[in-house]
C-alpha cells in the first residue's frame, strides 16, 4: 500500500467537512460521556482553561476512556486505566472521533473557554490509473 501510494497515477479524492464551536463554561459546567461519530478526527483547543484543578481533584479534567472494553475478563483499571488530562492555555488535543470522553465538573470561579472541532470525511474516491488487474 505504501509503495502504491507513491505512484503518481494513484490518487485519493476526499470530500471533507469541518465544524467548530466555542464553549464558555462557568462553575459546575461539565460534559457527559460522548464521542463525535461520524467525525474522523475531533479536537479541542483551550483558550483559557480557568483555574487549574487542585491536587487530587478532577475539576475540569478531560477524561478519555479506553476503547478496548471487550478485552475480556482482565481488571480494566489495572491494565488500561482511563487517560486524565489537565487543560492548559494553548493546549490542543486531537483524537479519533469515535473515542469516548467527558469533562469532569469544573469547580473554579473563573470562566473556561475552549474551541472544539470535528473533521469529517463525507466521501472519498480512490483512483488507481496504473492498475492492470
Name the predicted role of every residue range.
Residues 16-94, 104, 111, 121-132:
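Catalytic core of non-heme Fe(II) oxygenases with the double-stranded beta-helix
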Amino acid at each position: 500500500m505504501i509503495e502504491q501510494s507513491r505512484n503518481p497515477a494513484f490518487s485519493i479524492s476526499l470530500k471533507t467537512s469541518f465544524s467548530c464551536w466555542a464553549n464558555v463554561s462557568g462553575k459546575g459546567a461539565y460534559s457527559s460521556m460522548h464521542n463525535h461519530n461520524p467525525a474522523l478526527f475531533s479536537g479541542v483547543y483551550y483558550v483559557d482553561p480557568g483555574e487549574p484543578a487542585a491536587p487530587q481533584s478532577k475539576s475540569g479534567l478531560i477524561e478519555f476512556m479506553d476503547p478496548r472494553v471487550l478485552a475480556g475478563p482482565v481488571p480494566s483499571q489495572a491494565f488500561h486505566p482511563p487517560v486524565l488530562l489537565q487543560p492548559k492555555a494553548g493546549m490542543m488535543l486531537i483524537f479519533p472521533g469515535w473515542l469516548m470522553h467527558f469533562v469532569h465538573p469544573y469547580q473554579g470561579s473563573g470562566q473556561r473557554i475552549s474551541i472544539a472541532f470535528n473533521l469529517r470525511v463525507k466521501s472519498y474516491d480512490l483512483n488507481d490509473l496504473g492498475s492492470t488487474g
